[in-house]
Amino acid sequence: MKVIHTIKDLQAELSVLKAQGKKVGLVPTMGALHAGHASLVKRSVNENEVTVVSVFVNPTQFNDKNDLVKYPRTLDADCKLLEACGATYAFAPSVEEMYPEPDTRQFSYAPLDTVMEGAFRPGHFNGVCQIVSKLFEAVKPHRAYFGEKDFQQLAIIREMVRQMQFDLEIVGCPIVREEDGLALSSRNARLSAEERENALKISQTLFKSRTFAATHTVSETLKFVEDAITAVPGLRLEYFEIVDGNTLQKVDNWNQTSYVVGCITVFCGDVRLIDNIKYKES
């Protein structure tokens, strides 16, 4: 595996491989890689002759600068993991390489980007679209891989691809969990042992809510989850919403649509964790 730091060098390598008819998969990451990322990389390696993994902590998507400072940066360990997964290139640019001048582009995909994360992290998805569109333009991949843990982000990127007419396939990949059910996240590394124990309640509650939902209404299921999370000292619920998996708009009853997802964000101490669960999938 080769580590590349500039767009120019990456494009020089890729143009040769594309000329040979090789398919290129892109896995955009912010580093601090774990088994969830590894599953995306392995899927790309399986489906494309060439896999590029970007490792870049994107400053424009952090609405909380403190979160940006604290975000773990572990490039050496990341490269070892990527090599083991069979990636062809790790693309690790500097901020100056990706943003030679400030990116003033404004992306608006309402109502997808105005609810949930969009409401609580203003500017976040604009930053995501800035960097992902730059990566798509630099790499011009045939496929790009994103985890379903960031469910709203995946929906917004699909819409961005549609509106900007990028010629590529977006591949959504299932959430990867620890054996005990906790959704893998780079932020889990910041949890104390006690916080880690509390955080388990998030996925446990979501799984229980799926059984509960089979015999209860949407509003009863919302209350079931809210009550279970708020009962745990050390957890603070930011939001839990039950939405149409395509439009991300709230649903009032289970029969409203064939694709229903529950999306949750919880502060565990000062670490913000997200998760989701599918109640109905067509």
UniProtKB/Swiss-Prot annotation:
<dbReference type="InterPro" id="IPR042176">
    <property type="entry name" value="Pantoate_ligase_C"/>
</dbReference>
<keyword id="KW-0963">Cytoplasm</keyword>
<feature type="active site" description="Proton donor">
    <location>
        <position position="37"/>
    </location>
</feature>
<feature type="binding site">
    <location>
        <position position="61"/>
    </location>
    <ligand>
        <name>(R)-pantoate</name>
    </ligand>
</feature>
<feature type="binding site">
    <location>
        <begin position="147"/>
        <end position="150"/>
    </location>
    <ligand>
        <name>ATP</name>
    </ligand>
</feature>
<dbReference type="Pfam" id="PF02569">
    <property type="entry name" value="Pantoate_ligase"/>
</dbReference>
<feature type="binding site">
    <location>
        <position position="153"/>
    </location>
    <ligand>
        <name>(R)-pantoate</name>
    </ligand>
</feature>
<keyword id="KW-0566">Pantothenate biosynthesis</keyword>
<dbReference type="GO" id="GO:0005524">
    <property type="term" value="F:ATP binding"/>
</dbReference>
<dbReference type="GO" id="GO:0004592">
    <property type="term" value="F:pantoate-beta-alanine ligase activity"/>
</dbReference>
<protein>
    <recommendedName>
        <fullName>Pantothenate synthetase</fullName>
        <ecNumber>6.3.2.1</ecNumber>
    </recommendedName>
</protein>
<feature type="binding site">
    <location>
        <begin position="30"/>
        <end position="37"/>
    </location>
    <ligand>
        <name>ATP</name>
    </ligand>
</feature>
<feature type="binding site">
    <location>
        <begin position="184"/>
        <end position="187"/>
    </location>
    <ligand>
        <name>ATP</name>
    </ligand>
</feature>
<dbReference type="InterPro" id="IPR003721">
    <property type="entry name" value="Pantoate_ligase"/>
</dbReference>
<keyword id="KW-0067">ATP-binding</keyword>
<comment type="pathway">
    <text>Cofactor biosynthesis; (R)-pantothenate biosynthesis; (R)-pantothenate from (R)-pantoate and beta-alanine: step 1/1.</text>
</comment>
<keyword id="KW-0547">Nucleotide-binding</keyword>
<dbReference type="GO" id="GO:0005829">
    <property type="term" value="C:cytosol"/>
</dbReference>
<comment type="similarity">
    <text>Belongs to the pantothenate synthetase family.</text>
</comment>
<feature type="binding site">
    <location>
        <position position="176"/>
    </location>
    <ligand>
        <name>ATP</name>
    </ligand>
</feature>
<keyword id="KW-0436">Ligase</keyword>
<comment type="subunit">
    <text>Homodimer.</text>
</comment>
<feature type="binding site">
    <location>
        <position position="61"/>
    </location>
    <ligand>
        <name>beta-alanine</name>
    </ligand>
</feature>
<comment type="function">
    <text>Catalyzes the condensation of pantoate with beta-alanine in an ATP-dependent reaction via a pantoyl-adenylate intermediate.</text>
</comment>
<dbReference type="InterPro" id="IPR014729">
    <property type="entry name" value="Rossmann-like_a/b/a_fold"/>
</dbReference>
<dbReference type="GO" id="GO:0015940">
    <property type="term" value="P:pantothenate biosynthetic process"/>
</dbReference>
